[in-house]
Amino acid sequence: MKKNRISKNWINKQKRDIYVRQSQVDGYRARSAYKLIEIDEKFKIFKNGISVIDLGASPGSWSQYISRTVKSGRLVSIDLKGMEEIENTIQIKGDFTDLESQEKIKALFKSKVDVVVSDMAVNTTGIKDIDAIYTGELAMEAMNFSKEMLVKEGRFVSKIFLGSSFNEIVALGKKLFKEVKVFKPKSSRKESKESFIICKILR
C-alpha cells in the first residue's frame, strides 16, 4: 500500500511539474534538459561548430540540447544504457569509468575537444550521504578525464551533490581550472541537494 501511495504521489508531482510539461512541448526526453539550458544561458558553454563529450547521457535530453546548439560540431555521448538515436550524435554504450570506453571516446576525436559535460549519478542506495560520495567520485573522474581531453580554453560541467565530497570536488576544480563556479538551476528541484560545477580555462 505504501509503495502504491508513493507511486501515485510521484505521478501527481510529475503532472504538476512545469518542466516535465514543457519538455513534452519542446520534444526533450527529460526535464533535465532545462538544467543544462539554464547553465548555458548563464555561463555561455555551447556554440555552433564546437566538439563536445556528454558523459552519462541517457535518456538523452542533454545530448538533444547540445546537438541542437552545436549543429555542425561533433558530439559523442556515452552511457551504460542504450538510448534512441539523436541527430548529429555518436553514441557509445558502455561504462565511462572503464579505460576501454575512454579510449573509444578518444579515438573519435582527432584533436582536443571544447566541452565535456557529465550528468552521471550512481544508482541510489537510499542513503543520501553515500549517494553523494559515489556521485562525487564520478564527478572527479570526469573532471580528470576532461583535463586530458579539453583545449586550453575548454569548459567542464558536472552534476555534484552537497555532501562530504563537495569541498574536495571544488578544490580539484580550482586545481585544474582557472574559473570555477557552483550553480543550482531553478529547474533543479528545491528538495534536491543537486548542484552543478562549471569550470573554464585549464591551468
From Swiss-Prot:
It is an enzyme of class 2 (transferase). It is found in: Cytoplasm. Its EC number is 2.1.1.166. It catalyses: uridine(2552) in 23S rRNA + S-adenosyl-L-methionine = 2'-O-methyluridine(2552) in 23S rRNA + S-adenosyl-L-homocysteine + H(+). It comes from the Bacteria. The active site is at K159. GO terms for molecular function: rRNA (uridine-2'-O-)-methyltransferase activity. GO terms for cellular component: cytoplasm. Keywords: Cytoplasm, Methyltransferase, rRNA processing, S-adenosyl-L-methionine, Transferase. The keyword Transferase applies. Pfam families: FtsJ. Its main location: cytoplasm. S-adenosyl-L-methionine binds at G60, W62, D79, D95, D119. Transmembrane segments: none annotated. Belongs to the class I-like SAM-binding methyltransferase superfamily. RNA methyltransferase RlmE family. Specifically methylates the uridine in position 2552 of 23S rRNA at the 2'-O position of the ribose in the fully assembled 50S ribosomal subunit. This is Ribosomal RNA large subunit methyltransferase E. The lineage of its organism: Bacteria, Pseudomonadati, Pseudomonadota, Alphaproteobacteria, Candidatus Pelagibacterales.
